[in-house]
Amino acid sequence: MAENSNIDDIKAPLLAALGAADLALATVNELITNLRERAEETRTDTRSRVEESRARLTKLQEDLPEQLTELREKFTAEELRKAAEGYLEAATSRYNELVERGEAALERLRSQQSFEEVSARAEGYVDQAVELTQEALGTVASQTRAVGERAAKLVGIELPKKAAPAKKAAPAKKAAPAKKAAAKKAPAKKAAAKKVTQK
C-alpha cells in the first residue's frame, strides 16, 4: 500500500507536466495554423495589389503621351517661363523677408543689456576654465615628478635637480597674461607644499 501512495504522489505531477506539454503543443499548432492562414491571405492580397499596380502602370503608359500633348497645347514656352519667373520672385521675396527678420532679431539681442552681460560672463568662465586647467596640469606634473622621485629613490637612481624642470614650467606660465600667471603661481606653490608634507 505504501508503494501505491508513492505512485499516486508521483503520478499527479507527471500528469500535470504531460497536460502542460499537451497544452503547449496545442497552442503552438494553433499558432502555426493561424500563421499559415495569414500568410495565404497576405499572398493573395499581395498578388491582387501587384496586378492592380500593373494595370495602373499600363494605363499611365497609355495616358502619358496624351497628357503631355495636352500640356504642350495648354502652355507655350512663354507661359511656362512667366510661371517660373513668378515662382522665383515669390521665393526670392520670402527669402529676403526672412533675412530682414533675422537681422532685426539679432539687433534686438545685441541691444539688450543681458546679451552683453552673458557674453562677458561667458568670457569670464572661459578664462576661469583655462586657469583651472593650467593649474590642474601643473599639479599633475608636480605630483608625477614626486612619484618619479620616490620611485627613483627606491630603485637607487639619482634624478636631475628640480631647478631645471621649474625653469621650463615658468616660461609656459609667463605666456599667459600677467594677472593669470600670478594666480597660477600661488596655487602651484601650495601644491608643492602639500607634496613636501606627504613625504
Swiss-Prot record:
GO molecular function annotation: heparin binding; identical protein binding
Stretches with biased composition (Low complexity): 162-180
Gene Ontology biological process terms, A to Z: adhesion of symbiont to host epithelial cell; heterophilic cell-cell adhesion via plasma membrane cell adhesion molecules
Superkingdom of source: Bacteria
Gene3D superfamilies, alphabetized: Apolipoprotein A-I
Basic residues bias: start-end ranges: 181-199
Cellular component terms per the entry's GO annotation: cell surface; cytosol; peptidoglycan-based cell wall; plasma membrane
Miscellaneous remark of the record: Serum from patients diagnosed with active tuberculosis that had not been vaccinated contains antibodies that recognize HbhA, whereas serum from healthy individuals does not contain any.
Comment text on domains: Heparin binding seems to require the C-terminal domain of HbhA. Progressive truncations from the C-terminal end diminish the affinity for heparin.
Family under the similarity heading: To M.leprae HbhA.
Function as written in the Swiss-Prot or TrEMBL entry: Required for extrapulmonary dissemination. Mediates adherence to epithelial cells by binding to sulfated glycoconjugates present at the surface of these cells; binds heparin, dextran sulfate, fucoidan and chondroitin sulfate. Promotes hemagglutination of erythrocytes of certain host species. Induces mycobacterial aggregation.
Protein name: Heparin-binding hemagglutinin
Organism: Mycobacterium tuberculosis (strain ATCC 25618 / H37Rv)
Organism ancestry: Bacteria, Bacillati, Actinomycetota, Actinomycetes, Mycobacteriales
Gene that encodes it: hbhA
